[in-house]
Amino acid sequence: MPIAKFKSPSSHELLSKPLNTIEHEMRSTGTSGLPSISRRCSDTVDTAVVAIYAMYREFLGISKGAGLYVCPSTEEIPEMGMIKALNMLAGLLDTHRFMVKQERFVPEDALAQLQSWENKFTRHIIGPPFLIHRLLQFLQQTGRRIKLDKGSMVITLGGWKRFTGQMISRREFNLMCEEYLGLAPNGVRDIYALVESNVMAIDDEHQIKHVSPYVHFTVRDMNDLSREVPDGEKGVLGILDPLALATPGMILTEDIVSLVPGASPSGRSGQRMEYIMRAPSSLEFGCCAVNLEKKMDGTEAEEAACPVVN
């Protein structure tokens, strides 16, 4: 099933279970402004929650600490898939704070919160790359540095392309984390996920993404979707998701990826993937993080243009 079907007005036709069995509805809105709507029945939610926490434990190993969420809370945007997935991590932490409120992010407040947790908790920074990059740029521009803790992580989800089309360099991002947060590259973990699927691919300590063992990735020839390409070759990603009990279990995404050949240096088995780009034919070039950035930048521009009346 082409993933674009989830954006159509007839997306309810994808359901293989009655609407009264649907427990949860999740959305992701990219640059087109059209929401992709994914509905999950109770059985899917039950198994997906267990599966996602298993992935978090395997690749992040978090069971305590403090989470600085550089993103809005689920209270503000309860239906956004990216926020929902990141918020699940909060259940493994001792405490957490959301630093984006009413579409505004104040880096000074985020830094003050990190400093208040110093010597009390292992501090983790969690959010989409563009917002964590803003925090890093603030540290760079003000000449400030902080030293995170042993076991600290920067955890990203939401894609590396900004709404302007500009890419955030992963290499530059890693170097900035090392320079301004005192965090080695193996402490930076990126997550690939789709609201339309229950898949989650998380970086290991070598920054290679491991695919959830309960799904199967198939990479298809870009010129002939009936043909599967060998590992190491790029193509269009298809996902077989047996946890999707109310929606199609096989979807064709608009992402270009490759499967990493050979054995994993981490010793883990299973599929590993490298994300390359969004397909040129796609009407979207980003996910909900891109739309969030666009809205936040619009809010900041409106505030800057508003005259102060004494």
What is each PLM-predicted segment?
Residues 65, 88-310:
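Active-site glycine/GP-rich loop and adjacent strand/helix microenvironment
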Residues 74-75, 196:
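Conserved nucleotide-binding/hydrolysis micro-motifs of P-loop NTPases
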Residues 1-73, 79-82, 91, 103-104, ...:
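Nucleotide 5′-phosphate-binding alpha/beta core
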